Amino acid sequence: MYVAVKGGEAAIDAAHKLLAHRRRGDPAVPDLTVTQIREQLALAVNRVMSEGSLYDPDLAALAIKQARGDLIEAIFLLRAYRTTLPRFGHSEPMETGAMRIHRRISATFKDLPGGQILGPTFDYTHRLLDGGLADGIAIDEPDRVPGEPEIVAPRVVTHLDRQGLIEADDTAADDQPVGDVTREPLSFPSDRDVRLQALARGDEGFLLSLGYSTQRGHGRTHPFAGEIRMGEVDVFFSPEELGFDVPLGSVTLTECEMINQFKGSQTAPPQFTRGYGLVFGHSERKAISMALVDRALRASELGEETGAPAQDQQFVLPHLDNVQATGFVEHLKLPHYVDFQAELVLLRQLRSEWEAAQNTATKPSAGDTQDVVRDEAEAAE
């Protein structure tokens, strides 16, 4: 338990001023603009939007600047701002199959309808520091094909679906209510729609560790990356007073469909199963990790053995939110004076009782004293 502390307002005000000074850095260096962060630190912006549950690159960039680059603090800032926004309703389900693709790869099929598109990726870089970036050397323009149309391609799993080799998509019916982890507390067991929401806004590092654990034998499902795609998807909203869909714009998404082995059961034939990941922006690592953990959490419903951490809803879901985790861990910095004084009183009492017991155990009895005197007398003779 921590308690309120009186006083310290002047110190807190001074700390805020010092924080602003440290955030600005050397005044001789040009100030870092929100536009620069948005355009040149886009992957950090994407993570803040994803885990902050708010798609707004400018606000995410502002949060990163305000947090001095601490992404979890930036996520906290964005979520706090999100709570002040009015909610007009839900958008229509997005059709990621109509995504305007910037990157698309598959680890299961070499030749795909629509082809594989490497796009912007670190996958084949040599991981050597580029001194040219420090010197501000101009970057070559990417190769472009004049008049190149936007690329739209069908999903890879559609090919397996037509052959009945993969489980049917369990997309909820349009009239079935969907949970909302931002308004309703988690309950167990959680349905898959709730789990996917929690995973989508969960901490990337925690998901990465859980996904990695499944590859080291703790809930292994032998996954294949069926398809990873990144691109823009249109968002539609249907106002009640209009009765038809209105386009609101587009968002950049990364989608991962993982294909996993399944030996079958008494009610289901041997077939592939699905793991799914979908996140804001370009964030393949998180989308892959999300798909791995999604599939691991389905072990019980598929009749598989459970016991691994990644398969336990009550371990995964309550612990993957980095804002909650940060609040609980960092609250240890707050005053705990009363608790600690109580611990001190208890410890001193226990020490006093222990010392008394030790003195009693080591104090010689009357018989022992007589034996000692007799031994000394015999030694003197």
Question: What positions do the PLM features span?
Answer:
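Acidic, serine/proline-rich low-complexity intrinsically disordered regions
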Residues: 143-381
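N-terminal, Lys/Arg-enriched amphipathic/low-complexity engagement segments
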Residues: 1-50, 99-119, 123
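A ubiquitous, low-specificity "background" feature that marks scattered single residues
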Residues: 76, 95, 106-109, 113, ...
